[in-house]
């Protein structure tokens, strides 16, 4: 029997990272939900306000809007730019409460003398003259982009879920060992006796161990970053050495400021590495690379270097906050060194409908996004989810989810680790 969306049957989302939460927002924005208001439950091991955990990368990574749409991929370019426009307007309206900050972004390229054409569509785009290029840099551009503070952004998603559902969406902290456990009394006591109409599996690395999924193609890509406090730096910098390859190739060094004065420095890509603690030698390497692309991180350089420009609501320095004086100034700025596991997958993202559970519950997979969370949240997955929704009987689901509404809650973000 094909699953149907009887409005009395719950929809269950497994996972409460940025993928799971944005999936919930999408469902709540749908015409079907507004008409029928089926129960929606989120079941997760980790929640946004939990202590930092390498397996829950959503709150650890640096994040910014930085498209990697190929020049020939016109559709993805349109999605990414529309997302930027919506997010930029959110920042203009809400300021730091949005979890976003507009800033000048500088992209440095080593070993190549061109850039993605989508950068030229951003405000304030310019190509840096050769005379202004740092040592060993072959090409550079700058433009206005957006940085995100994940904890603030995720908190806003949680508030949206509550608001859109009139506090009817239930979030349960529960370790689900296997999909068949959804019929266990300990779960039915939470979600009701009716079997779920649909289960959305947004578990990231959890897909490796979740019974009934056990996807052996899932693996961690370890990322280490350094969080410092340097509120005088309000511009973002990225250096790409080698082929970009969709944002995951070569070596990338980045400096991502946040609205609260923190800065994320990174990063690393270590496939299959489960070590959850920072490595001291990696921290030193990140600091060295970050200083190469942004000397203003070191307060001593502020005497001879101009302050990074800002497009933000906040001043560069708070009234009572001055650059510290210290023998090792970068060491004095460090808040923490952090490790997170990108939920990577051989073969790429799994976004598809699988076999029904017990012949009565539709199963939709949405995991394996690695560091490219934005591709998980843009227009292409929307269309796939709509396709699955129609097969499930979500008639008219898209009627209430136009492009503007969808992108306003599900942005194109690049999570950096």
From Swiss-Prot:
Induction: Expression increases when grown on D-alanine, D-asparagine, D-glutamate, D-methionine, D-valine or D-proline as nitrogen source.
Enzyme class: oxidoreductase
Keywords: FAD, Flavoprotein, Oxidoreductase
Disruption phenotype: Decreases growth on D-aspartate nitrogen source. Triple knockout of DAO1, DAO2 and DAO3 decreases growth on D-tryptophan, D-tyrosine and D-asparagine nitrogen sources and decreases virulence in a mouse intrapharyngeal aspiration model and an intravenous injection model of infection.
Cellular component GO terms, alphabetical: cytoplasm
The reaction(s) this protein catalyses: D-aspartate + O2 + H2O = oxaloacetate + H2O2 + NH4(+)
A Gene Ontology biological process term: D-amino acid catabolic process
Pfam families: DAO
Role of this protein: Selectively catalyzes the oxidative deamination of acidic amino acids. Protects the organism from the toxicity of D-amino acids. Enables the organism to utilize D-amino acids as a source of nutrients. Enables the organism to utilize D-aspartate as a source of nitrogen and may also contribute to utilization of D-tryptophan, D-tyrosine and D-asparagine as a nitrogen source. May play a role in its interaction with the host.
Family, as annotated: Belongs to the DAMOX/DASOX family.
Family annotation (PANTHER family): D-AMINO ACID OXIDASE, D-ASPARTATE OXIDASE
Name used for this protein in its record: D-aspartate oxidase
Species of provenance: Cryptococcus deuterogattii (strain R265) (Cryptococcus gattii VGII (strain R265))
């Amino acid at each position: 029997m094909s699953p149907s969306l009887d409005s009395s049957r719950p929809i269950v989302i497994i996972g409460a990272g940025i993928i799971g939460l944005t999936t919930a927002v999408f469902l709540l924005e749908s015409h079907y939900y507004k008409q029928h208001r089926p129960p929606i439950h989120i079941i997760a091991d980790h929640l946004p306000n939990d202590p930092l955990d390498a397996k829950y990368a959503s709150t650890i990574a640096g994040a910014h809007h930085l498209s990697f749409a190929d020049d020939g991929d016109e559709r993805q370019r349109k999605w990414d730019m529309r997302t930027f426009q919506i997010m930029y307007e959110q920042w203009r309206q809400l300021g730091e409460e949005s979890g976003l900050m507009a800033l000048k972004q500088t992209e440095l390229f080593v070993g190549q003398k061109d850039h993605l054409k989508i950068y030229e569509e951003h405000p304030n785009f310019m190509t840096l003259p050769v005379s202004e290029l740092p040592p060993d840099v072959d090409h550079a551009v700058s433009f206005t982009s957006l940085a995100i503070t994940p904890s603030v952004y995720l908190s806003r998603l949680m508030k949206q879920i509550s608001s859109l559902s009139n506090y009817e969406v239930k979030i349960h902290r529960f370790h689900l060992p296997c999909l068949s456990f959804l019929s266990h009394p300990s779960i039915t006591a939470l979600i009701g006796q009716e079997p779920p109409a649909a289960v959305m599996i947004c578990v990231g690395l959890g897909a490796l161990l979740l019974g009934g999924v056990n996807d052996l193609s899932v693996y961690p890509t370890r990322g280490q970053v350094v969080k410092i406090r340097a509120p005088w730096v309000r511009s973002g910098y990225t250096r790409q050495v080698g082929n970009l390859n969709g944002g995951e190739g070569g070596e990338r060094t980045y400096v991502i400021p946040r609205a609260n004065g923190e800065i994320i420095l990174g990063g690393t890509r270590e496939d299959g590495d489960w070590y959850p603690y920072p490595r001291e030698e990696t921290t030193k390497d990140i600091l060295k690379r970050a200083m190469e692309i942004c000397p203003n991180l070191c307060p001593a350089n502020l005497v001879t270097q101009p302050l990074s420009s800002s497009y933000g609501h906040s001043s560069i320095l708070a009234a009572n906050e001055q650059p510290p004086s210290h023998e090792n100034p970068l060491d004095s700025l460090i808040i923490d060194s952090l490790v997170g596991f990108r939920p990577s997958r051989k073969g790429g993202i799994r976004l598809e409908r699988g076999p029904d559970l017990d012949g009565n519950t539709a199963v939709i997979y949405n995991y394996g996004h690695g560091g490219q969370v934005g591709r998980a949240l843009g227009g292409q997955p929307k269309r796939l989810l709509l396709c699955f929704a129609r097969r499930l009987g979500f008639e008219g689901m898209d009627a209430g989810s136009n492009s503007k509404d969808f992108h306003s809650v599900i942005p194109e973000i690049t999570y950096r680790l």
